[in-house]
Design a protein with these regions (language model features):
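Membrane metalloprotein/metal-transporter helix-bundle signature
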Residues: 2-187
């Protein structure tokens, strides 16, 4: 709890521009805050955690870790300006498809689930990378959005783990995510 509070304070701090190292702090804060600025990113990150909880065992750590690794690759592509087509459609599809998979409730091989989630991560990372504020440190910004994404994955994982004993509730959460994804895509 203390570490969450500390991260929140650091993320919300607005450093004076005359201070040395301000790009590191503002870069981290901008990166950490970015995933929380839109329902599309929040839904996708939480859904990765829910899906990992549903799959269980190794997927509980490989799915979030693989997602974050590929999201950082996507972020680098976005920061360098290398184009990825249909980024917004890929982000919306990630929410809808992850929601359907959670609602459907069929087990996946962890490697196949990680490949699917990682392909979605490229779109999310690209969006994060394209929106890096001018003057932000690339490393600090990237660490910020990676840690925020991890926090959302862990929230989904904890929620999903709590719901697995009542699998009907987990499937219903998948339906809710799917409907929210449709709203993001077409609303």
């Amino acid at each position: 709890m203390r570490s969450i509070l500390a991260i929140s304070v650091v993320a919300s701090a607005t450093p004076a521009l005359a201070h040395r190292g301000q790009h590191l702090i503002s870069g981290f804060a901008a990166g950490f805050g970015h995933p929380f600025t839109g329902p599309d990113h929040v839904l996708a990150m939480v859904s990765v955690g829910l899906f990992a909880a549903f799959l269980g065992r190794r997927a509980t750590w490989t799915l979030p870790a693989g997602f974050i690794a590929m999201m950082l690759v996507g972020g680098a592509l976005g920061m360098t300006g290398i184009g990825i087509p249909a980024v917004e459609a890929g982000i919306a599809a990630s929410i809808i498809i992850l929601g359907i998979l959670i609602a459907w409730g069929r087990s996946w091989h962890p490697a196949a689930a990680m490949a699917l989630a990682s392909s979605f991560a490229l779109f999310h990372g690209y969006a994060h990378g394209m929106e890096i504020p001018e003057g932000s440190g690339v490393l600090a910004y990237s660490v910020g959005f990676a840690l925020a994404s991890l926090a959302l994955h862990l929230f989904g994982l904890a929620t999903g783990t709590g719901l697995t004993k009542q699998s009907q509730a987990l499937h219903i959460s998948g339906v809710v995510v799917t409907l929210a994804g449709l709203w993001v895509a077409f609303g």
